[in-house]
Regions:
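OB-fold single-stranded nucleic acid-binding module
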Residues: 23-124
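Bacterial N-terminal signal peptides
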Residues: 8-17
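Bacterial N-terminal signal peptides that target proteins for export
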Residues: 1-8
């Protein structure tokens, strides 16, 4: 009986490894539109930024590869999490970055909400 339990645990463990890996595949900002609802790592150059301090939620927008208003992908940082990022609108501007999280859309533009600094990696 103990052997069957061990076998079941190992089977479940090895069956979940490919799923976890597949959920965090690396894609470009342009490819994000084809992965809505997926967890992924999206990479691109921060083309424009904006801190909307007078808007509800005080969002900061980091647009990858194309500047606003023609953005193709946005990293959204809410004001409640902003302190974890310093001044993201200046710290990340013009840098190559990758962000990991669930891809959603807002007004037709794919985005990932970054709640933790570790979600955004700078690539030089």
């Amino acid at each position: 009986m103990k052997g069957l339990r061990c076998l079941a645990v190992l089977t479940i463990f090895f069956l979940t490894i490919p799923c976890v890996h597949a959920q965090t595949k690396k894609i470009t900002a342009a490819e994000a539109k084809d992965h809505i609802g997926d967890r992924a790592t999206v990479c691109g150059k921060v083309a424009s930024t904006h801190y909307a301090k007078n808007s509800k939620g005080e969002p900061t927008f980091l647009n990858l590869d194309e500047p606003y208003p023609k953005e193709i992908f946005t990293i959204l940082i809410w004001g409640s999490d902003r302190g974890k990022f310093g001044t993201p609108e200046s710290e990340y501007k013009s840098l190559q970055v990758c962000v990991t999280g669930k891809i959603t859309t807002y007004r037709g533009v794919p985005e990932i909400v970054a709640n933790e600094r570790e979600q955004i990696e700078i690539h030089k």
